């Protein structure tokens, strides 16, 4: 990358990643990944980081994640379980503390609502609802808007709007998050919008931000003649001047 850090990947005979090493100067940080298929057809993927912390993911024969477990340092396990409908849509996440989140879909299998609940009282399977998000789409099934609500008993308060825009190819050209109760105007959306630009081949060439982050106003992407990403440059804003700085570069073998 731009700081001359090198990331190396290793693979098994099934082209699955088994190791990731990142060299930063004289320090190398490595993660190892292992896979175990049980007699029931389920696969357990274990990721061990440089500190010895282990995360496990169990997937079924359909490739759907049934559970994830953070083993941490071995003293406490934190597990999240997942369930699905007959179409493979995730319909519930259940957390280690007993809280859970539900997912609803329309006839097109588009996500239209999520609801979050606290753990139920002793002997009760349904907890108190705390959050709700609803999603809307255009005629091409592209996500146009999501609205987040905070729930307190029977009272719902709008807390966030997320807006999306697309070009004729269906590529995202605008994304905006607005934390407010009232529906945003077009000007408010524009003021908070991240914008995405593409070349004639549909490759992302630039991302511009409504506000600077660490001085970066935009990111530009460069490609080689084969269409492979070779460089990411940051447009750094300082006082009245703007300069470009390479933040990451990529090389490929033959």
What are these regions, as identified by a protein language model?
Residues 1-254:
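Beta-strand elements of repeat-based all-beta scaffolds
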């Amino acid at each position: 990358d731009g700081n001359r850090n090198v990331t190396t990947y290793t693979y098994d005979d099934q082209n699955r990643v088994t190791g990731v090493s990142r060299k930063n100067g004289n320090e190398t940080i490595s993660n190892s990944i292992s896979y175990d298929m049980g007699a029931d057809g389920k696969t357990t993927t274990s990721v061990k980081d440089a500190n010895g912390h282990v995360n496990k993911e169990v997937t079924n024969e359909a490739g759907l994640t049934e559970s994830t477990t953070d083993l941490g340092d071995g003293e406490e396990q934190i597990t999240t379980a997942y369930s699905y409908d007959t179409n493979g849509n995730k319909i519930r996440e259940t957390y280690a503390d007993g809280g859970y989140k539900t997912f609803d879909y329309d006839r097109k299998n588009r996500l239209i609502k999520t609801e979050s609940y606290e753990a139920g009282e002793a002997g009760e399977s349904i907890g108190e609802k705390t959050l709700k998000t609803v999603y809307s789409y255009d005629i091409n099934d592209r996500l146009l808007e999501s609205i987040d609500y905070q729930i307190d008993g029977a009272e719902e308060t709008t807390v966030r709007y997320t807006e999306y825009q697309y070009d004729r190819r269906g590529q995202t050209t605008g994304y905006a998050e607005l934390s407010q109760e009232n529906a945003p105007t077009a000007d408010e959306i524009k003021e908070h919008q991240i914008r995405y630009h593409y070349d004639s081949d549909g490759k992302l060439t630039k991302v511009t931000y409504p506000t600077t982050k660490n001085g970066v106003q935009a990111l530009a992407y460069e490609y080689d003649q084969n269409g492979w990403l070779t460089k990411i440059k940051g447009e750094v804003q300082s006082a009245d001047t703007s300069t470009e700085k390479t933040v990451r570069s990529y090389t490929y073998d033959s």
